[in-house]
Amino acid sequence: MLDQDLGQLGDGLLFAAVIVYALAMLGFAGEQASRKARRAVTAVRAESKVLLGAGGPPVTLPPPSPPAQTITVESPSRAGRFALALTFCGWGVHVTSLVLRGFAAHRVPWGNMYEFSSAAALVAVTFFLVLVARGKVERALGAFVMLPVVLYLGLASTVLYTAAGPLVPALNSYWIKIHVAAAITASGSFLLSGVVAVLYLLRNRYDGRLAAGQPVRFPVSLGAQLPAAPVLDRVSYSVIAFAFPVWTFAVIAGAIWAESAWGRYWGWDPKETWSFITWVLYAGYLHARATAGWKGRKAAWVAVAAAGALIIDYYVVNIFVVGLHSYA
């Protein structure tokens, strides 16, 4: 098979992976809808149970005590199992698309923004599947994870698409296997942690309105479908705690590569500046949790701000800002 054919096949498989991920997202959403329906039926039945006193007025049962802030294991639904299977299938197709892309270009498959985005999304999906397999998050959370992944890959396949080909001369170095691979791993993980931080804020807002007796409207009402707020907080923290050392290594490796390519370790190029800003925000997040006890809303907002800096670092700087990294 010709290199061009391999490249086209890899592109087609990525498109297929996006379709499978989208179907998985619908399956996860279906599982959430079925759980919501079961909870509604259970609530109606509980309210309808009345104890009749001896010759007295009806006495309603007291409301049950609130559940503990842990993940509850419910009977698996067919939609949820099917969605998880689809996610695994999409993951396999996604991996194959990247491998074929590498064979077609005769290099590592992360030499441009299109390939970087695909690889980072793959890391996010991989991390999610690992968390589900280890019981750290509920399977139904996949609806909220797959949505940004599908949008992310859709953007990469349309706006950022680049045909398979050789590296630009500036990237033709063994450091691309080290520096960029670390950046991809950290970026995909940070993408997932940012999504979970947003979901935490949604759940926290939902709990607050419910406790205050205030009306709950969309999108805050989506918080009812999410795991408990402390669970989301722990998941976001765990992912960032893993990704931050990897990002630190990526920044250091990039500085070493810069010295080899441009004769200096650091020059405050726009890419370097925003990579450092991103590093500072995530370092501040971890430091605040460890020393000041920042958890919950404060920590979540810092995580969201850091994810925003990462997006600026990757998209805005690479596309709209002229600098030494403009070729990326």
Task: List the model feature ranges, each with a label.
Residues 1-328:
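Polytopic transmembrane helical bundles with strong interfacial aromatic enrichment
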